[in-house]
Amino acid sequence: RAIGVWIALVAALSVFLHGMEVRAATFDITNQCPYTVWAAASPGGGQQLDQGQTWTIQVAAGTTQARIWARTGCSFDGSGRGTCQTGDCNGMLSCQGYGQVPATLAEYALNQYMNLDFYDISLVDGFNVPLSMTPTSTDPNCKGRIACLSDINSQCPSDLKVTGGCKSACARYNTPEYCCTGASENTCGPTDYSKFFKGQCPQAYSYAKDDATSTFTCPSGTNYKVVFCG
């Protein structure tokens, strides 16, 4: 009888855990820009996207420190090796890590604290292409669409401007004040540069400690759409 009870308990636990299991998230990445971009994802790789094209990736639950971005001004050979003006990742079409600055980032971590996904748009690495990030969930606890669609490149401060993009102050000067490192790690605040970026894109991270107005959540198991220029 004890064995029967134990088997019943194990079976019940198995059903419970199966119900808690969170599936991989699907990310549909679409280019609505009037020019070609080379989408990059870590994890995920990379894909050339002409205007109107979509690339779909699957990302495992529990993935952290993940990001999606657009590369511009790229040229790759038949083996997938080449260079990009912005967002380049070690000269590879299929990215195996993070890209070079400047690049507008869609960042996320899946199935974290309280079974939530955390997602944001970041300008901490600067800006190259407008983008939006939209969860598919209709859960009222899900923030919904976030976007950075301003034409920052045309308004970029002259000392941050580079071909095809606009660097952040941290990327340009690499000082504790702008990067929130060293003695400034726990005390740094907005600067004139970060206020410029925040004014252009209020929902995006403008510097490393800009969490309060820039991090959003959805229930785990949500799928997402990332759209460049839309």
Swiss-Prot record:
Keywords: Allergen, Disulfide bond, Pathogenesis-related protein, Plant defense, Signal, Stress response. The keyword Disulfide bond applies. One of its GO terms (biological process) is response to arachidonate. Residues 1-24 form the signal peptide. Disulfide bonds join C33-C229, C74-C84, C89-C95, C142-C218, C148-C201, C156-C166, C170-C179, C180-C188. This is Pathogenesis-related thaumatin-like protein 3.3. InterPro entries: Osmotin/thaumatin-like_sf, Thaumatin, Thaumatin_CS. SMART domains: THN. May be involved in disease resistance. Belongs to the thaumatin family.
